[in-house]
UniProtKB/Swiss-Prot annotation:
Homodimer. It comes from the Bacteria. One of its GO terms (cellular component) is cytoplasm. GO terms for biological process: histidyl-tRNA aminoacylation. This is Histidine--tRNA ligase. HAMAP family: His_tRNA_synth. SUPFAM superfamilies: Class II aaRS ABD-related, Class II aaRS and biotin synthetases. PROSITE patterns: AA_TRNA_LIGASE_II. It comes from Buchnera aphidicola subsp. Schizaphis graminum (strain Sg).
């Protein structure tokens, strides 16, 4: 017996039943983004490894442990994108989009990270990314937060999600703070948990994210980042908070909130939920005002966010908000005898040409008529049309209304009109 083949660990198939929810979510997302005048951009899955190293930082978990990198046949180091912002920045620089006054972009697609798979965290995962370039005032920070808030309301999850926000100042501010944070944590070096010991001299900001109870107690005594932030960043953040207050947006100022990627500065935020265990961040983002210049472009302010689609789907499924009920087939066409198959196909195409919105299914199964009729009923089809040699010869077709339990005989032209009456009632 051949050994069963399986997908790569941490990479999943998304089957039609689940994708019904995905498509409904994606449609809502796209409508909201369009209403805010954001334009879609489609980006390569592969990028040069060095741009992630430059942008994300060599001593981050993403670059050190999580990237899928390899060399191509010419020896170039390439990486499956672990996130979308870097590729988007590369694209706007390469294609001179900022000179065309293009500012607001969105994309949706797979990202890849070599992490330990668990509920809500996979090695291939889908993200919505939204990026805005060229605007440096807190007004655009507010627009981003208003947009996300509107999305949560339209999805029906706004009561199950909370916003945490912080300002992490400039890179220089964080360098000053990092020295003080390391100096403080060295006093507790012997009792730090293993993750914190590893990060103490490489990426101490990630220690602020620790979920360890002992670490949380220690961090309560730690110096606060806000005391090292420049006046401009403080004013920017205070202005944003005042505007959020005026719009009634609820938020938590989490002074330990930092982001795991080096390119962030000033405003950072996360939207969190409680329903899916430790992987409770469903949306995260912030400003990255130096990244465009660091990757070779002109100095350009920027802000963006990403939403994990799998985590969003998990939440919506747990709340039973969006139904994945099978959409009914409108017309189920049954042909009797192999010789009548061509006529059945032709009729289905003719109906599609006249009524392109209808869902039409042609049953190609080689089984009895009674079995095909049962299949039509089980499919929840609205009507079934039976086609046999006699029907074609006499131009008289049996239409079974499976919802009302009625049967009719029609000529082909009458059949086309009856379909219109059934599915295109006046006013619809």
């Amino acid at each position: 017996m051949n050994k069963k083949i399986n997908s790569v660990r941490g990479m999943h198939d998304y089957l039609p039943e689940e994708l019904k929810i995905w498509k409904k979510i994606e449609n809502i997302i796209q409508k909201i983004l369009t209403s805010y005048c954001y334009e879609e951009i489609r980006l390569p899955i592969l990028e040069k490894t060095k741009i992630f190293q430059r942008a994300i930082g060599n001593i981050t978990d993403v670059v050190e442990k999580e990237m899928y990198s390899f060399k191509d046949k010419k020896g170039n180091s390439l990486t499956l994108r672990p996130e979308g912002t870097v590729g988007c920045v590369r694209a706007i620089i390469e294609n001179n989009l900022l000179f065309q006054k293009k500012q607001r972009f969105w994309y949706l697609g797979p990202m890849f990270r070599y992490e330990r798979p668990q509920k809500g965290r996979y090695r291939q995962f889908y993200q919505l990314g939204v990026e805005v370039f060229g605007l440096n005032t807190p007004d655009i920070d507010l627009e981003i937060i208003l947009l996300i808030s509107r999305l949560w309301k339209c999805l029906g999850i706004n009561l199950h999600i909370k916003l945490e926000i912080n300002s992490i100042g400039s890179k220089l501010d964080r360098i000053k703070y990092q020295k003080e944070l390391v100096f403080f944590l060295e006093k507790y070096k012997n009792i730090l948990d293993e993750d914190s010991k590893k990060r103490l001299y490489t990426n101490p900001f990630r220690i602020l994210d620790s979920k360890n109870d002992m670490m949380q107690k220690i961090l309560k005594k730690a110096p606060l980042l806000k005391n090292y932030i420049n006046t401009s960043a403080i004013n920017h953040f205070n202005s944003l908070c005042n505007m959020m207050d005026s719009y009634g947006i609820k938020y938590i100022h989490n002074q330990n909130l930092v982001r795991g990627l080096d390119y962030y500065n000033s405003t950072v935020f996360e939207w969190k939920i409680d329903q899916i265990g430790s992987q409770n961040t469903i949306c995260a983002g912030g400003r990255y005002d130096s990244l465009v210049q660091e990757l070779g472009g002109n100095k350009t302010s920027a802000i963006g966010f990403a939403i994990g689609i799998e985590r969003l789907v998990l939440l919506i499924k747990s709340l039973n908000i969006i139904s994945c009920k099978e959409e009914d087939i409108n017309i189920y066409i049954i042909f009797i005898g192999e010789l009548n198959k061509i006529y059945a196909i032709s009729l289905s195409e003719e109906i599609r040409n006249i009524y392109p919105k209808l869902k039409i299914f042609v049953d190609f199964m080689t089984c009895s008529l009674s079995k095909k009729i049962k299949n039509a009923v089980d499919s929840l089809a609205h009507i079934a049309i039976l086609i046999g040699a006699n029907e074609i010869k006499k131009n008289c077709f049996l239409l079974k209304d499976l919802k009302r339990g009625r049967e009719y005989f029609f000529s082909k032209s009458e059949l086309i009109l009856k379909i219109k009456k059934i599915f295109y009632k006046q006013g619809n």
